[in-house]
A protein has these predicted regions:
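Active-site bordering "gate/hinge" segments
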Residues: 1-329, 334-337, 497-518
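Dual-mode signal for accessory low-complexity, basic/Gly-rich regions
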Residues: 291-518
């Protein structure tokens, strides 16, 4: 189990050692102890399997030092780290690496400084997740897997396809995925904030894909939480149900459709397009489609997006950033208007002192300052808050809210004719992020809407969406009432989002040649 007091002592002693060395102007010592536990799900009805496999864990701990050094050319900035050694010898080696790698950075102003904001989230981790043992980890896997198996067994559609209970396994029923638990413990101390601060975080998540292989049908399910008690069999049950619903998928022609985006597609669009576009570094590099638009409308007036970094119970919440600054709420888009950015201390200071600030944000420094508060400096990597990297800008909990929300059934009725897109893959900007153009493939959990109701599943991997994210944001026509925490592959943030309807989404039919091969 992580020991925050030990980490705090290492940060305090490390800072004292570094500060006493010749040529050091200011320094920051970051200490981390991370554990990631995983159990893999692997059920195949037609191939012998274990159901739950590979319970395993990884652990990383160490310290990183960021320091500025005196030189005849001005301050030099360096970073060094040392794994698995929090002793004075480890501190000395990390400092030596920082000194030897130090370079002149004319845009560096200072290491983070405290402001008026104070920490609001403390003692929010789950002791049960910190103390979980191997048997409990395996039991978590079985809980999620059992939800999927029950979903398959109670699906009348599968009984009709198989003809008998004994023949069910010949349909090729598959459940794959994992349950992952992350335990994070950090301490940080710096010249500007010499008293060590600690933060302990726990989270648990599950991802499941269900398949009816003989019918080329698949579905997905997931869950997010911060406590062991949050884990249910929901992810497995959802994956099985959606796989069954996907049987008999149909194609649609190329065209512009009103699309209801499910939570996973919205999360993927946020992760790959909207969140990067709202980062201070993107404005500095003039690589955002929102360039020069702070205070201007960039989305439908019914849409608001913010990063909620300190809300209890949300999976991405932290007490402090990896720069030792308080987390909190950062409004990005409010009622369709761009009002803020995600920023680390370095990126905020760099942009505030940029001669081209007004061109890049659209306002002068006094108006820009409230939109450049450093609440998003995190050291993400290796399954936790990494000691061996410098802070970068990262969101925590992206929350999407819409005015006049309705039920999903009501939203489907209002669409009349269109598509429900429940899962996309390979989402990326084309022509550069600034252009806003993007493409993605619809890979499952999707349906055709006619006359205000769902009439058939959309066949997976038969359409691509090619559109522009600024156009999508501006053409939101409805949102649902319920939000759910959602993760996508390689994302650092969790997105809490409803389902969202957008008009005029361009869809291209693909892979038509596959029909001739069937």
């Amino acid at each position: 189990m992580p020991d925050p007091a030990r980490l705090a002592d290492a940060a305090r002693e490390g800072l004292a050692f570094v500060s006493a060395q010749p040529g050091v102007i200011e320094a920051e010592v970051f200490v981390a102890d991370n554990r990631s536990l995983l159990t893999r799900l692997n059920y195949t009805s037609h191939i012998p399997c274990n159901g739950v496999e590979e319970p395993k864990s990884t652990e990383t701990y160490g310290l990183g030092i960021q320091a500025s050094f005196e030189s005849s050319d001005g301050p030099l900035l360096g970073f060094g780290s040392e794994p698995s050694d929090l002793s004075p010898a480890g501190v000395a080696r990390a400092l030596d690496k920082a000194r030897r790698g130090a370079v002149r950075d004319p845009e560096f102003r200072s290491l983070p400084r405290p402001g008026a904001a104070r920490r609001v989230l403390v003692d929010y981790h789950d002791p049960a997740l910190l103390a979980i043992d191997d048997a409990q980890l395996v039991e978590c896997g079985w809980k999620v897997l059992q939800g999927g198996l029950n979903g398959f067994l109670t699906a009348s559609r599968l009984g009709e396809l198989a003809g008998s209970d004994e023949a069910l396994r010949t349909l090729g029923l598959i459940l794959g995925g994992d349950v992952t638990i992350v335990q994070e413990s950090i301490a940080i101390a710096s010249t500007a904030m010499p008293e060590p601060q600690t933060d302990v975080t726990t989270l648990i998540m599950s991802f499941v894909t269900g398949m009816v292989e003989s019918r080329d049908a698949k579905g997905s399910g997931w869950s997010t939480g911060t406590r062991l008690a949050d884990l249910t069999d929901e992810a497995g049950a959802d994956a099985a149900r959606r796989a069954v619903e996907a049987v008999g998928g149909e194609r649609v022609p190329t065209g512009d459709y009103t699309v209801i985006f499910g939570r996973q597609p919205i999360t993927d669009l946020m992760n790959n397009l909207v969140v990067p576009s709202c980062q201070a570094g993107s404005f500095y590099a003039s690589s955002t489609p929102f360039l020069g638009k702070l205070g201007k409308r960039v989305a439908s007036p019914r849409l608001s997006i913010y990063d909620e970094g300190a809300m209890p119970g949300l999976m991405g919440s932290k007490g402090i950033t990896c720069e030792g600054l308080p987390t909190g709420r950062t409004n990005l888009i409010k009622d369709g208007v761009l009002v803020g950015t995600l920023a680390s201390w370095y990126e905020a200071q760099r942009l505030l002192h940029d001669p081209g600030l007004k061109e890049k944000l659209g306002v002068d420094a006094s108006e820009a300052a409230p939109a450049l508060v450093a609440r998003s400096g995190f050291r993400t990597g290796s399954g936790g808050r990494a000691f061996d990297t410098q802070p970068e800008t990262s969101a925590s909990n992206i929350v999407i809210a819409g005015s006049d929300p309705v039920s999903l059934d009501e939203l489907i009725r209002s669409v009349r004719d269109g598509l429900y897109v429940g899962r996309i893959w390979y989402t990326y900007p084309i022509n550069g992020l600034r252009a806003g153009d993007f493409t993605c493939t619809v890979v499952g959990d999707s349906f055709i809407i006619r006359d205000g109701r769902i009439v058939a599943p959309l066949k997976a991997n038969t359409v691509r969406i090619n559109d522009n994210i600024t156009r999508v944001l501006e053409h939101v026509v409805g949102v649902t009432k319920d939000t759910k925490g959602t993760l996508v592959w390689a994302a650092e943030e969790v997105v809490y989002t409803p389902e969202i309807a957008v008009t005029g989404v361009h869809v291209d039919a693909i892979a038509g040649f596959m029909e001739a091969l069937a």
